[in-house]
């Protein structure tokens, strides 16, 4: 792993933790840009700073990134010059609650909508 500045993968909570000190630049990423950034980094040069299976599903199943086992590490401060991809989940109650019936008769109801977007974060100073 690059001892200087591994790429950090953050979620809503871990992003708030690393923003406690310094100057940062943040920009929105398309899913294609996020996938490209992940693919150009070696597995050993990426740290996963969250424990969310939902976000891992976004990375590997939705973005289509090859399954890798990124090392987990709790990070409190980003280093100057360090970059991160932030996966922001936004959950809202469902305005409609359609009911579906499975083949075996089980009933399920939609209760929420889940949205995700990506940001690229760099610590400047």
Task: Cite the ranges covered by each PLM segment.
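Acidic, low-complexity, intrinsically disordered interaction modules
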Residues: 44-96
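Intrinsic-disorder-associated interaction segments
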Residues: 23-31, 39, 48, 52, ...
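Polybasic, proline/glycine-rich intrinsically disordered low-complexity segments
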Residues: 77-125
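N-terminal low-complexity, intrinsically disordered segments
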Residues: 2-44
């Amino acid at each position: 792993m690059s001892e200087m500045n591994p790429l950090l993968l953050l979620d809503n909570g871990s992003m708030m933790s690393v923003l406690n000190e310094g100057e940062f630049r943040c920009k929105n990423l398309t899913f294609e840009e996020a996938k490209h950034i992940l693919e150009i980094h070696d597995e050993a040069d990426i740290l996963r700073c969250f424990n969310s299976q939902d976000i891992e599903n976004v990375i590997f199943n939705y973005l289509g990134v090859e399954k890798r086992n990124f090392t987990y590490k709790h990070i409190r401060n980003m280093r100057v010059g360090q970059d991160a991809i932030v996966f922001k989940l936004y959950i809202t109650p469902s305005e409609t609650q359609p009911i579906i019936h499975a083949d075996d008769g089980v009933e399920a109801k939609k209760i929420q909508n889940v949205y995700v977007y990506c940001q690229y974060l760099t610590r400047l100073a």
